[in-house]
Amino acid sequence: THLDTGAMYRVITWGLKKENIDIDDISSVNSFLEKTNISYKNANEIMLNGKLLSTEIRKKDITSNVSAVSALLEVREFLVKIQRKLGNEIDCVIEGRDIGSVVFPNADFKFFLTADLDVRSMRRKNELKKLGEDLSIDEVKASMLRRDRIDSSREFSPLKRSEDSIEIDSTDLTIDEQIEKIIKIIKKK
């Protein structure tokens, strides 16, 4: 099973926007979280209070707001609790910007994937195009730089590589090659 924790932050962002909740209004954010149920229809189909949101959460308006939402301590604590519960209940690969450093600091295997900004931007542009959003490469690159800056400098659980993680540069690797490389490393240990 694969758990994309970034999707969880995107779902919360979508829900807050849908309810017109200002993220600076922490009382309203907390009220929203209290009535929030995140579940999965299938491994990669995330739901918020029973509504399937797999494609809506990948769109530009969510992407441009998710870093600000994920910087909120209340949101992080709420989602980390869910992530730890799921991670302890099932065998899974968990993907996220603070999994190895905060959520599961004692995980058996930790990989930190990197890639050249131009390659990451093109991958994201192609992903957005599949969702019907045709942004310029410069727009995508600017969005990624902004998100990286916000996520790396946030007060709670900033994006950072844990010292005991294995860094893999995926710039010149396909998804299958990345998986193959990770499996080889796991089998060696």
Language model feature labels by segment:
Residues 1-58:
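N-terminal phosphate/diphosphate-binding loop that engages ATP/GTP or pyrophosphate donors
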Residues 54-66, 70-131:
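ATP-dependent NMP and nucleoside kinases share a basic, alpha-helical "lid"
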